[in-house]
Curated annotation (Swiss-Prot):
Belongs to the HesB/IscA family. Its cofactor is iron-sulfur cluster. This is Iron-sulfur cluster insertion protein ErpA. GO terms for cellular component: cytosol. Binds 1 iron-sulfur cluster per subunit. One of its GO terms (biological process) is iron-sulfur cluster assembly. It comes from Blochmanniella pennsylvanica (strain BPEN).
Amino acid sequence: MNNDAKFPIQLTDFAARKVKFFTENEIINSNSHLKLRVYIIGGGCSGFQYRFILDDKISSDDCIVENNGVSLVIDPMSLQYLFGGIIDYYEGLEGSRFVVINPNAKNTCSCGSSFSV
């Protein structure tokens, strides 16, 4: 496992508070071992899509970033697309969601969930 000192990706304080809220919420059985995993899949209108899940499994080659007791987990393949990025949480009229501020994205779709490099 790697830490955030080697891999420059940030989890904002607000996003960390939201992860903590979700993992402590009764709906998901108060599993404090859950971590926010962000990963990339092919698809979407721009070629790649961001996905987020709460996960309790960690691989030995995953990158782990900590903020206020909350862990963000990224697999090595996804990390190459997210390097230097910021994971945040957005709340607005159209809903709320985790978002990626990705300096590697050349183009993004209007909803912000897909990108190209």
